[in-house]
Amino acid sequence: ADAVVVAAPFWDLSYPAALRTYIEYISAVGLTYHYTDAGCCGGCAAEHLVYLASGGDVEREDSVGVIHWRQLAAMFGIPQFDYVFAGGLDASPDTAGETLAAACALAENLARTL
């Protein structure tokens, strides 16, 4: 694949346990990365990993979900990482529609680059 797109809800500062379990299954030496004398080397052919999420609160650049997916992209050898987050949907219900529309527009623009 040229790109990997992961979409998940933002729950309790991260993403669902089922997705974490999936990551454990695919994070395997010889499958998504390997080791050389120089250290860990990614084994994925994808050029881009995109993390899409939405949630009731606001996710930031330094939140667990974003950091984890950014680090996994690097570990797997995927050079480009982006994320789109529609956050604060419960915290600011009056602007939830605008927030979703902005995130969808950002995701659509990003999809054109894949």
Role assignments for model-derived ranges:
Residues 1-67:
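Helix-loop-strand module that forms the ligand-binding subsite of alpha/beta enzymes
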Residues 67-114:
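Glycine-rich phosphate/pyrophosphate-binding loop and the adjoining helix
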